[in-house]
């Protein structure tokens, strides 16, 4: 319950603090390519441009289908778009499996993304990696991701998502979402 309250608080702060330019809600089917275990991942994302910087906030909850547990993480990023490409840095907070004391950890993020008009929609893709300390035991992860957004009505789009994780976490995912632009 504390995590849900924290997520709701972050969402309200994100929208009110810098007037979000967009909000996305997404549900993905995720499959671990090593253990073959699968789960549903739910995302809530907010983003805005403030003083020429791209600010982002992502909240993710994964629920294992076999009932063994939940994973939850929150990431905040800041980037600068140059010639249509946005390199960014950020911080992540992972509660670990089931939020058990001692399993939580923080990590840095570095990434790059960009997009372009493609047919009736917009294609967007990128890659991000966790930047842990050299001797950290926290899991390392690099994610390549892509989204194709199809306009439904003015300022609302339907999103098709794909991603692949590498390093310590090996996952493939696909999903659907909605984005509202403000």
Regions found by a protein language model. Give the residues of each.
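Outer-membrane beta-barrel proteins
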Residues: 2-182
